[in-house]
């Protein structure tokens, strides 16, 4: 007896729920002991964005004091990071203050984890479904994107590894930025590889850019795809509106703080009393945050430098070398972006997405160094790793390739588990 369409639909939904539940369980079981989500804590005392949200509630832009990377400009202290986390904290603190005046401005940990980390498995799963994977394989790839990349140790900086590097990193803003950006990048992929509503890709761009500024370069494939839609004008308008909003708020905040919409304030971290000022001083005595001279060294670390492997009384250990480590060693799956280059190049959408990662990578390579918090991995690879995985997804599904991918996954999980104790 052939089941009715309604019965089949119910069965598919039940299977989908079970697969997602298993994906979340796998992430919790694998990452939980080292990431320690229950220990995540964020408040104005340990995070610049949270401190700025408190300042917004008081009707000001200035911070009460210097903590972490903050800008000292005209005698005032300002947050210099993109605004997404500030907006999230502002909404939460405003709501809790309205409900219970005098309540401490501390994020309720389960809700904090739910907003920052919980969307990623679901959205990564949908991104890989849109990329061409079936229901089961999309879950495997989503797990790889989380446990098989440096997203694992980056998230560990907020929980288990925070104690190893000092309490100031219990809400290390750089880690939170990378994690939030994954949500935005996944949404971009879901839309551009799916129905191409364009406003949804624009929303993903906003989330990613308000977390990591270099992700704004993904507006290039969004606008290019909008230009090539059958209803060009409508698609461009739907894409341009969120792109404009993405620019407007950070630009307005920059203008209000530093008098220039293009001035992020980052160079004002390095005032004359900052011991790291020498890192960014050029021959002219001025601060230079970007430079072509940084490219060779950073490129070597991102793509060539091997990890350090050694044996202790506890067994085999892997750690960083220099201290960054090339992405291929921890995540060998990315080698397929080179092996399958001709394949993804023939797909116009995948091609333009992959091409957009080139300026994203190059801007990161021009950034002054060293890159903090990257022992055994290179955290800037998170700005494009999800894009690369989506580009090669259709060619990971063959019988032979699946076994190769599973072997890569086993190695990657072992690798990032091994370095999870290295801040």
Regions found by a protein language model. Give the residues of each.
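Membrane-proximal envelope and lipid/glycan-remodeling enzymes
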Residues: 1-423
